[in-house]
Regions:
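Active-site metal-binding loops of divalent metal-dependent hydrolases
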Residues: 11, 164-165
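Extended, basic/helix-rich recognition subdomains
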Residues: 149, 165-170
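Helix-loop module immediately N-terminal to the HCX5R catalytic loop
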Residues: 42, 138-153
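Generic beta-sheet signal
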Residues: 5, 55, 157-163
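Active-site-proximal alpha-helix that buttresses catalytic centers in soluble enzyme cores
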Residues: 2-84, 181
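Short beta-strand scaffold positions
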Residues: 59-60, 142, 162-163
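Phosphate-handling substructures
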Residues: 15, 20-25, 72-145, 214-233
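Acidic, low-complexity terminal tails and accessory targeting/binding regions
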Residues: 1-5, 93-112, 169-237
Length: 237
């Protein structure tokens, strides 16, 4: 049986306050949001976690998502739940605030996160080799499908994913996420017209698990560029 998935947006980071930041960490407010998120997740899911092998945590290898994961899901890690980085869950654009740092510079600060399977292309998003991570409608929609396929194949019953608003909204599920809020989804039995996996949100998180997020859905791929406007086309030749 496919897992239930808990999709979490990272808490407030410095780029949410002022945009000119490279790979920004959480703000003090963001750390406070993690405390509220942790309390809610612990109350909601603690009894559902009997066997740590039935649970997994997947996290974008960005500093703000790693911090959010370790501050809000530490109680799962302490119970033996595995936590691993995955480049498919990174944010959409190639701006400095949405581009990560080399794993070698990040992993020492997060020793409990398994980074061994992070794509060797990380943090590249603009070279021809890294087209799968490009800021384009085609690449982001394909990445969203790939990310869901990977979750669907996993053996765990419950998977927490800490990711980013833009990717979750436009590439994966079509809903807005407030900083430090989450939504819970189950896989549908039937696939879409193009063979894509479909997920259905649980009613209890229609406004977010903390009640902070908008209820109106958004079309996947809405307003995403056909090509990354910040990348020189000649670089792909």
């Amino acid at each position: 049986m496919p897992p239930t998935i808990v999709l979490i947006r990272h808490a407030q980071a410095f780029h949410n306050v002022a945009h000119k930041f490279s790979h920004p960490p959480l703000t003090e407010k963001g750390e406070g949001q993690c405390s509220l998120l942790r309390e809610n997740l612990l109350e909601t899911f603690s009894n559902a976690v009997e066997n740590p092998e039935d649970v997994a945590i997947i996290v974008s290898p960005m500093r703000r998502t790693l911090q959010t994961a370790m501050l809000s899901l530490d109680w799962l890690v302490e119970r033996g739940v595995k936590i691993e980085g995955n480049a498919d869950w990174q944010e959409n654009s190639a701006k400095p605030s949405d581009t990560g740092s080399p794993i070698s510079s990040v992993s020492p600060d997060f020793p409990k996160v398994n980074m061994s399977n992070v794509d060797a292309l990380w943090p590249d998003k603009t070279s021809p080799a890294a087209e799968r991570y490009a800021y384009s409608k085609k690449s982001i929609l394909a990445r969203g499908r790939r990310a869901l396929e990977d979750l669907h194949k996993r053996p765990e019953k419950l998977i927490f994913v800490v990711s980013h608003s833009g990717f979750l909204r436009l590439g994966v599920v079509g809903y807005w996420f407030f900083n430090g809020d989450y939504r819970v989804f189950d896989f549908e039995a039937e696939r879409g017209d193009e063979g894509e996996l479909r997920v259905k949100q649980q009613d209890k998180t229609l406004s977010g698990g903390l009640g902070l997020s908008l209820t109106d859905p958004v079309a996947l791929g809405h307003d995403l560029p056909e090509e990354d406007p910040e990348v020189d086309p000649s670089a792909k030749e």
